[in-house]
Curated annotation (Swiss-Prot):
One of its GO terms (molecular function) is calcium ion binding. Residues 18-30 have a biased composition (Low complexity). Belongs to the PsbQ family. It comes from the Eukaryota. This is Oxygen-evolving enhancer protein 3, chloroplastic. Keywords: Chloroplast, Membrane, Photosynthesis, Photosystem II, Plastid, Thylakoid, Transit peptide. Residues 15-57 are annotated as: Disordered. Residues 1-82 form a transit peptide. It is found in: Plastid, Chloroplast thylakoid membrane. GO terms for cellular component: chloroplast thylakoid membrane; extrinsic component of membrane; photosystem II oxygen evolving complex.
Amino acid sequence: MAQAMASGLLEGSLQLMSGSNRSSSSSRTRGPAGVFIVRAQQQEQQQGMSSSAADPQSNRRAMLGLVATGLASASFVQAVLAEAKPIKVGGPPPPSGGLGGTLNSDEARDLKLPLKERFYIQPLSPTEAAQRQRESAKEIVAVKKFIDQKLGHMFINDLRLRASYLRYDLNTVISSKPKEQKQSLKESSAGKLFQDIDNLDYAAKLKSAPQAEKYYADAVSTLNDVLSKIG
């Protein structure tokens, strides 16, 4: 009986010893793995700290690059502006037609006058005005071809332009005539002439070929009468 109890105690102690040995061996084998994990975590933390320390440096470098680019562009713009050549601007044109398009720049304008009497044409001498009025008369007579083709609306602008020149030049020529001729020419011949031209203008605006032919014949007849009286 005593021997059996002694053998049982011996086996239990041996089992305890074997279990402790196993636990110690397992703890010994697990030790290096834990150390490796701790070291890996330390390395990751060090890398994160180094990357966070490098971020301000990269931002600082980017800012310095932007500043350098801005300074270079500013210096380039200054160089371009410094090389710009000034534009030479001449003085004002001389009075009464010193340059093209200024022939009537110094004429007085009376805005209270009717539009037909408000002229923007350079004054000419009576001789030059008589020559230009003959040219205007030829242009007015030449609108017959448009009337024959029933294209009366195509000459309205030219008819108005030539009528304006003719009115202005007739006034210049009539003003140079003796006093007893001025009034009769203005009232009888010249007045009727421009009324006939206005009627022709209106007929062309309406695109009425019969009326255009009628008023054209009246205008040409009156025009020839006026030119024959003025000479």
